[in-house]
């Protein structure tokens, strides 16, 4: 993942902070619940798409929990902190949970990695920015993103809040 443009940009900022002489803190979330909202959106529509088989593990964190980690880190002695949510699960398990919360039968379409990599190359020809984003998404589908459990809000609770809002807006 370190060869991706988006990761390199983040790491340049980290390097600059380290060399700046400033009193700094770096918080590295493993993923965000807000990114998981797309799983609920797809499940509510009846079909979810996964890049690759979805066996990689992750423990994304809720924004509110991440804010608490940031405050705690700013007040603490640790300079660099990784932050994950309370639940470690695979991407497939997260998609299945979204279907459960949406009350829909599980229908998951797997986009093979070879096809996803080809699509990334095509997208990159059309737009460097979207190509970099697509490359990040595909790469994230291949690796684990697990960190220390620092959050308390579960993914199920987050998805249930999306479901409640979805039902209210109908």
Label every PLM stretch briefly:
Residues 34-41, 72-81, 104-106:
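Glycine/proline-rich active-site loop of Rossmann-fold NAD(P)-dependent oxidoreductases
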Residues 1-44:
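Glycine-/Pro-rich loop/turn segments that contact NAD(P) or position catalytic residues
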Residues 140-170:
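Amphipathic terminal alpha-helices
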Residues 42-52:
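A short C-terminal helix-loop "cap" of Rossmann-like NAD(P)-dependent dehydrogenase/epimerase domains
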Residues 52-74, 79:
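Substrate-positioning beta->alpha
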Residues 57-64, 83-101, 114-118, 153:
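Substrate-binding strand-loop-helix patch
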Residues 67-74, 95-98, 155, 162:
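Hydrophobic "lid"/C-terminal helical patch
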Residues 93-142:
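Terminal hydrophobic/aromatic helix or amphipathic segment near a protein terminus
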């Amino acid at each position: 993942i370190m060869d991706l443009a988006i990761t390199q940009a983040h790491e340049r900022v980290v390097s600059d902070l380290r060399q700046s002489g400033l009193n700094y803190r770096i918080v590295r979330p493993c993923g965000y619940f807000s990114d998981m909202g797309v799983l609920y959106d797809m499940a509510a529509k009846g079909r979810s798409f996964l890049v690759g088989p979805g066996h990689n593990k992750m423990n994304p964190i809720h924004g509110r929990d991440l804010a608490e980690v940031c405050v705690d880190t700013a007040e603490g002695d640790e300079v660099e902190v990784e932050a994950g949510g309370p639940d470690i699960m695979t991407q497939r398990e997260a998609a299945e949970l979204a279907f459960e919360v949406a009350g829909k039968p599980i229908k998951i379409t797997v986009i093979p990695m070879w096809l996803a990599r080809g699509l990334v190359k095509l997208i990159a020809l059309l737009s460097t920015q979207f190509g970099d984003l697509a490359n990040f998404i595909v790469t994230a589908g291949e690796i684990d993103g697990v960190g220390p459990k620092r959050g308390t809000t579960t993914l199920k609770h987050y998805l249930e809040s999306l479901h409640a809002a979805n039902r209210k807006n109908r």
